Amino acid sequence: MTSNAELADWCQRQSEDAARQIELFGGGGVRAILEMPDGTTQDITAGVVAHQTDNIAMFARLIAALTA
């Protein structure tokens, strides 16, 4: 069974990874492009940044609950 401390550590690592993705995609240097089966593409960079921003907030709440 995983302890609360181990879960909090995992959440912290996930949060750090999300922050790295925001740094990578948020600066405009790297874009996330989704290629559809029909060959069309869609830029999903803004969605990736928004999703990772939400993840950081969620992981912060989980860490707080696990370490309270």
Task: Explain the meaning of each model-derived region.
Residues 4, 11, 37-53:
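Amphipathic alpha-helical coiled-coil segments and their boundaries
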